[in-house]
Amino acid sequence: MKIAVGCDHIVTYEKIAVVDYLKSQGHKVIDCGTYDNVRTHYPIFGKKVGEAVASGKAELGVVICGTGVGITNAVNKVPGIRAALVRDMTSAIYSKEELNANVIGFGGKIIGGLLMNDIIDAFLAAEYKPTEENKKWIEKMDSLQHTNQDQNNPHFFDEFLEKWDRGEYHD
């Protein structure tokens, strides 16, 4: 599998470890940087990973910053990207199986490298399980990426809220 990986300067060593791990598992890696500890900005590298995945140059992506929050938010701004900030295998698997996530984000200063590798393995092994319900959710989320007059409609999510009120969702 071809995987794009990017980070900011705070977690360069963690990214290098992820790149090395992925290569050791037989994956091809597009290393989107950064490559050293010189001060930089996470949106640059979130965008690079997102563009690699959205364009099809990479099948999936991994982004890492100190907490994971900034770079995951940045990569989510790239049209066609559904990224999830994850800290456990359950969230990573859910993000792929239910939301068809194509990028996962980590807080490299929050989570250890061995756990990060396990979570990446779980994410890569998981497969999207399309249902009519999650297809609608994904379509709704994807529509938020573009200027869309429907977003100004106060009833944009009514269909889903009505189902909630009827008790159709079960956790």
UniProtKB/Swiss-Prot annotation:
EC number: 5.3.1.26
Catalytic activity annotation: aldehydo-D-galactose 6-phosphate = keto-D-tagatose 6-phosphate
GO biological-process terms attached to the record: D-allose catabolic process; galactose catabolic process; lactose catabolic process via tagatose-6-phosphate; pentose-phosphate shunt, non-oxidative branch
UniProt KW keywords: Isomerase, Lactose metabolism
This protein's pathway: Carbohydrate metabolism; D-galactose 6-phosphate degradation; D-tagatose 6-phosphate from D-galactose 6-phosphate: step 1/1
GO molecular function, one term: galactose-6-phosphate isomerase activity
Enzyme class: isomerase
Subunit structure and binding partners: Heteromultimeric protein consisting of LacA and LacB.
HAMAP family: LacB
Family from the record: Belongs to the LacAB/RpiB family.
Name of the protein in its database record: Galactose-6-phosphate isomerase subunit LacB 2
